[in-house]
Amino acid sequence: MEKIVVYTDGGCSGNPGPGGWACVVIDGDDARELSGGSRSTTNNQMELTAAINALSVIYNTPRFKSRKIEVNIDSQYVKNGITSWISKWKVNGWKTASKKPVVNQELWQQLDKLNSALDVEWKWVKGHAGVEYNEICDSLCQKQINLFK
């Protein structure tokens, strides 16, 4: 069975400011684009929201749930958070190493729930480097940001 390939992106005009998120969920030759935005948000919130929406589509599509998933993301914050930092945050009661509450905790908890229920491999891709689906996500993000300006 082919794996599901995902690309995500999130961004803001100002931080905080109007923001957008986008994802592309690819199953063989079928690519599904999703996007949304918010009038007042942060870059990191939009990056997390993109990943949550992508994994939600997969989780809620029965034929996808048992498949391997490759998430390509240009956010080191999300990639490192979900693959490394989150296990320590949970052990520490959602506190960072410096004993401060984890920023965007609710979003991290949503992402963790989906990530734990699926077979996900997280890969970092360089943003604005000509990676086709990453560029599509970036363009969709910009359209969403412009709706809220």
Place the predicted regions along the sequence by residue.
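RNase H-like nuclease fold core
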Residues: 1-45, 56-59, 138-143, 147-149
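RNase H catalytic domain
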Residues: 11-15, 52-136, 140, 144-147
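Short, conserved alpha-helix that lines the donor NDP-sugar binding/gating region
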Residues: 47, 51
